[in-house]
């Protein structure tokens, strides 16, 4: 039978014309070269209820990890004959594939922190992540680190806000976060207003305001209304000087503050005014002062403290320093090459503007930036060809780093948006917690307050109606639960109140005022006479909630008692 079983596949192959019919059974199959060793065995790994099977030699490829070393024996379950790990089974699937294929992949849908924790638990370094996933992993890692840093700084800022005891610390926080207090917000808007006034005055003073008396040419407004513009400039400089001195006083590290970019801008913006006060009317010195007044335009950079978009743009340019350096280097190299070629292509033309290679720089820059002023135009065919190639090269060179800059700007912008959103959510959450605490506290004490008010009204002889009781939130919940109980049990429950005189009263009837002398037995008798056996059973179950426990206690304390009981109505 075994020979027939061995012959049948061979005969089937011969029937379709593959090989001729053989008279002998098939030989034994050859031993595969990659057949596993006899000491290899199949291992069963249970990860949070999900079982994985693999070979021992597969795990021992990486002996420096947890699964590849003898440390895995600490997780071996003798009863189930398996290794048990209380970890994430979805991430473990990628870890096991790393042992099988030698390539570690990063799943984009998984949490980065959980993924790193699983790798650290199994002793796998994140550096072995494959090239196909490493860029995504690195970007997610950077974004997560920035997000955690923002949260940490925000938490530290909130904690430091409670610990601010020094005036310098309070002033510095007011300068950096003007929305923390009203005074800081007012100073923030005042400085912004004077920055705008200073910039506008610097522009308007150059506008012509008439002709010079006895001279040719126009007279600018800065000279015609010199006193007005001087007063405006003085007021603005005084505000800027006070702001700079206050920031310098409140800075945690004054040396670091002085070396910062914004500090240098503040100094450059106010120094021309003070230098101008000490300059005489000498023409040479006045000419130098006019040149120095150009630095007043740097006051516009002070708006970066008042504009989040400008700060994001600055952070973007700072993060794209390498890409911008590549752009400048590429443009400089292309300008030199095309200017040299253009000079030799146009130097033999009479009256040409390309008199030298530096003179051709202007044409190359204008052409590569696609401006094309037309003041310098090539006349030879070779020069026109070079100009066309120069224009196309400029488009390509400038367009290459633009996507990187845009992506960085978008990343930083969304990061700031997420930070602002988290701050708003944190404030809203704290506000909800405060409201919940206040509401819950008011709800808990409302019962006590209502009871005290009821006692005071009864002692003064005022009859209470149901509207007064309905104002209590617990009474409303009580009646709501009664209605739900009636719907579910198809029974009607009546609330009977035992007033001071011992007479049962339904909720709709007025509450009579009488002496507090009554007993628990009389109340029980009234309930039994009113509702019979059901009331008796209900009274025995609910008697422990009555205000007084016995006649002896009532007579001893001589305190008024009342109570409300639920009975099943039998009509």
Swiss-Prot record:
- Principal subcellular localisation of the protein: membrane
Record region (Disordered): 500-520
Q: Which GO terms describe its molecular function?
A: A-type (transient outward) potassium channel activity; voltage-gated potassium channel activity
SUPFAM superfamilies to which the protein is assigned, alphabetical: POZ domain (SSF54695), Voltage-gated potassium channels (SSF81324)
Q: Report the locations given in the UniProt record.
A: Membrane; Cell projection, Dendrite; Perikaryon
Provide the membrane topology annotation.
Answer: Multi-pass membrane protein
Mediates dendritic targeting as annotated region, ranges:
474-489
Question: Is Membrane given among the entry's keywords?
Answer: yes
Where is the motif named Selectivity filter mapped on this chain? 370-375
Q: Which Gene3D superfamilies match?
A: 1.10.287.70, Potassium Channel Kv1.1, Chain A, Voltage-gated potassium channels. Chain C
Its domain of life reads Eukaryota
Q: What is an example of a Pfam family matching this protein?
A: Ion_trans
Does the record's keyword annotation contain Protease? Answer: no
Where are glycans found on this sequence?
46, 350, 353, 408
Question: What does this protein's UniProt record list under function?
Answer: Mediates the voltage-dependent potassium ion permeability of excitable membranes. Assuming opened or closed conformations in response to the voltage difference across the membrane, the protein forms a potassium-selective channel through which potassium ions may pass in accordance with their electrochemical gradient. May play a role in the nervous system and in the regulation of beating frequency in pacemaker cells.
Q: Subunit structure of this entry?
A: Heterotetramer of potassium channel proteins. Interacts (via C-terminal dendritic targeting motif) with SIDL.
Name this protein carries in UniProt: Potassium voltage-gated channel protein Shal
What's the source species' lineage?
Eukaryota, Metazoa, Ecdysozoa, Arthropoda, Hexapoda
């Amino acid at each position: 039978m075994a020979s027939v079983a061995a012959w049948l596949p061979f005969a089937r192959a011969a029937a379709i014309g593959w090989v001729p019919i053989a008279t002998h059974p098939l030989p034994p199959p050859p031993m595969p070269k990659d057949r596993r060793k006899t000491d290899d065995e199949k291992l069963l790994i249970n990860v949070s209820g999900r079982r994985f099977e693999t070979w021992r030699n597969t795990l021992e490829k990486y002996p420096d990890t947890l699964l590849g070393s003898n440390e895995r024996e600490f997780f071996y379950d003798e009863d189930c004959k398996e290794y048990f790990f209380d970890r994430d089974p979805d991430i473990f699937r990628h870890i096991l594939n790393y042992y099988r294929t030698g390539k570690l992949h990063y799943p984009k849908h998984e949490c980065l922190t959980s993924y790193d924790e699983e790798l650290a638990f199994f002793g796998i370094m994140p550096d072995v992540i494959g090239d196909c996933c490493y860029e995504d992993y690195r970007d997610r890692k950077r974004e997560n680190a920035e997000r955690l840093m923002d949260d940490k700084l925000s938490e530290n800022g909130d904690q430091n806000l409670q610990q601010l005891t020094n005036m310098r610390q309070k002033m510095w926080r007011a300068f950096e976060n003007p929305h923390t207090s009203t005074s800081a917000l007012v100073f923030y808007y005042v400085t912004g207003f004077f920055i705008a006034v200073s910039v506008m005055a610097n522009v308007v003073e150059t506008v012509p305001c008439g002709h010079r008396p006895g001279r040719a040419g126009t007279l600018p407004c800065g000279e015609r209304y010199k006193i007005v513009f001087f007063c405006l400039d003085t007021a603005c400089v005084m505000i800027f000087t006070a702001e700079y001195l206050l920031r310098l006083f409140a800075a945690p590290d004054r040396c670091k503050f002085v070396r910062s970019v914004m500090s240098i801008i503040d100094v450059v913006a106010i120094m021309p005014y003070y230098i101008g006060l000490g300059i005489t009317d000498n023409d040479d010195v006045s000419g130098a002062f006019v040149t120095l007044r150009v630095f007043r335009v740097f006051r516009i950079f002070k708006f970066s403290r008042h504009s989040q978009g400008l700060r994001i743009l600055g952070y973007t340019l700072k993060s794209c320093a390498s890409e911008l350096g590549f752009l400048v280097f590429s443009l400089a190299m292309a300008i030199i090459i095309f200017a040299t070629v253009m000079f030799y292509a146009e130097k033999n033309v009479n009256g040409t503007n390309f008199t030298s290679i530096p003179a051709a720089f202007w044409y190359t820059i204008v052409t590569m930036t696609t401006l094309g002023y037309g003041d310098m135009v090539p006349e030879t065919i070779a020069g026109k060809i070079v100009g066309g190639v120069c224009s196309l090269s400029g488009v390509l060179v400038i367009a290459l780093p633009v996507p990187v800059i845009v992506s960085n700007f978008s990343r930083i912008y969304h990061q700031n948006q997420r930070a602002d959103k988290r701050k708003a959510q944190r404030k809203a959450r704290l506000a909800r917690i405060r409201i919940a605490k206040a509401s819950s506290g008011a709800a808990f004490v409302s019962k006590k307050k209502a009871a005290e008010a009821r006692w005071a009204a009864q002692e003064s002889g005022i009859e209470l109606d149901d509207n007064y009781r309905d104002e209590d939130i617990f009474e409303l919940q009580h009646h709501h639960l009664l209605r739900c109980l009636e719907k579910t049990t198809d029974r009607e429950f009546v609330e009977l109140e035992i007033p001071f005189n011992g007479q049962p009263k339904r909720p709709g009837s007025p509450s009579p005022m009488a002496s507090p002398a009554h007993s628990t037995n009389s109340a029980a008798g009234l309930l039994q006479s009113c509702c019979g056996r059901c009331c008796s059973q209900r009274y025995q179950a609910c008697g422990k909630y009555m205000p007084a426990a016995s006649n002896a206690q009532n007579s001893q304390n001589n305190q008024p008692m009342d109570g409300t009981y639920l009975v099943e109505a039998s009509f």
